[in-house]
Amino acid sequence: MESSEKIVVIFCTIPASESEAMARALVERRLVACVNVIPVYSYYRWNGEFCSEPEHLLIAKTKRSMAEATIAAIKSLHSYEVPEIIAVPVIAGYAPYLAWVHAETKDEV
């Protein structure tokens, strides 16, 4: 795998009612190879108010070259005004898994 095709992990919190549709859309479009969905409880401030919400955390794996397209897709499908979308590079991993992520995501938008 070329260095330009490194893998990233994208984290996104989303209402539980939207998580399956979001995960399915990202995988079916081949923007990501895999999405894990984990129930979480989020505490934060929004518009000056303390908030707490049950949500789902999506953990998506994709190629670095697909990160911006994935973020754009998440933004377009997400119901929040300012969704949490964070991409972090994978600095090491099991080579066969990383190769699988590379193979299962499309090469360009």
Task: List each model region and its residues.
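Positively charged, small/polar-rich N-terminal and surface patches that mediate targeting and assembly
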Residues: 1-109
